[in-house]
Amino acid sequence: KYLRHLLLLHPYTVVIYDELEASEAVRWDWLLHSPTQFQPDKDRNMSVTENTTKGFKTVVRQFSNSSFEYSQTDQFVVPPATPAPAQWHLTATYGPCAQNRILTIIQITPDSEQAPAIVRTGDSFQCDDWSIQAVLSPSQPAELIVTNRTNSALFSYSADNPVIDGSMYLRKSPRSSLLYDQSNGRYGVTEQTDYIPASTRAVDYEHKTNP
């Protein structure tokens, strides 16, 4: 099982929440790619890459109850058939476990600005005006709730029904992903259930056999 929720938080923050489950303890590799080299900092669970040509830098921070190690290479796993620009590939390798949760917060800022600090209290993360609550223990039901302290924006992936503008909003589907945000000057709710990405729908891992 794998589920990924990905959010873009205005103006420059990307949030990725991964739920990973296997039938036995396995190694998990989380990959990120960049045209410029990464500068990993294991003590702070972060990595930085800077594109001086285009004038921006990217700070990647990862949080999990499982320990991991960073590595990187500028080689493709499968060499391209035709010449391609050099790329850097960062891998966060998590030790063997049957279940894992990973919260990744990516901040992309101009070179002239400093990425806001992320303050963690348990499973709560404050990032500038955004409050992120992400359950990282696989023994607890998965949950991702994001709110903003300057407006009414809300994202809720949870078993509970959220409170929107002082009233309880009843989900149409259990554990749906619910977004309350402004569009064309008006706030509204968008609700969606999880689905399997098109790139993996044709793979039946349960019944797949080796040739």
Where in the sequence are the language-model features?
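CBM-like, beta-strand-rich accessory domains located in the C-terminal region of large
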Residues: K1-N210
